[in-house]
Amino acid sequence: MRCISRLPAVLLILSVALGHLRATPVGSGTNPQVDKRKCNTATCATQRLANFLVRSSNNLGPVLPPTNVGSNTYGKRNVAEDPNRESLDFLLL
């Protein structure tokens, strides 16, 4: 319970600290994919804070599993799959 009572103060301090961060412009490099993955300081800090808060405690709500964004995620189409039968099943309704 002591941890929960200190949470508003910690969040207030973190929000003030994040408010003072300045966004840095993303410089153009030679590789456009690397440029897309760069982020400014405020964005990275906000994402890390959100990630920490979501996974920090069970008392604050559900702990969400990490998002799977790899090549084998749900919804990706298998290249070797036969598209004739499975892709037309919705038309039979």
Curated annotation (Swiss-Prot):
Sequence positions bearing Tyrosine amide: 74
Alphabetical list of SMART domains matching this protein: CALCITONIN
Disulfide bonds: 39-44
Gene Ontology molecular function terms on file: hormone activity; identical protein binding; lipid binding; receptor ligand activity; signaling receptor binding
BP GO annotations: amylin receptor 1 signaling pathway; amylin receptor 2 signaling pathway; amylin receptor 3 signaling pathway; amylin receptor signaling pathway; bone resorption; eating behavior; glucose metabolic process; negative regulation of bone resorption
Propeptide stretches in the record: 24-35, 78-93
UniProt keyword annotations, A-Z: Amidation, Amyloid, Cleavage on pair of basic residues, Disulfide bond, Hormone, Secreted, Signal
Range of residues in the leader sequence: 1-23
Tissue spec: Abundant in the islets of Langerhans but is not present in the brain or seven other tissues examined.
InterPro entries: Calcitonin-like, Calcitonin/adrenomedullin, Calcitonin_CS, Calcitonin_peptide-like, IAPP
Domain notes: The mature protein is largely unstructured in the absence of a cognate ligand, but contrary to the human protein, it does not easily form fibrillar aggregates.
Known function: Amylin/IAPP is a glucoregulatory peptide hormone that plays an important role in the regulation of energy homeostasis. Selectively inhibits insulin-stimulated glucose utilization and glycogen deposition in muscle, while not affecting adipocyte glucose metabolism. IAPP function is mediated by the CALCR-RAMPs (AMYRs) receptor complexes. Amylin can also bind CALCR receptor in the absence of RAMPs, although it is more selective for AMYRs.
Protein name as catalogued: Islet amyloid polypeptide
Chain's gene name: Iapp
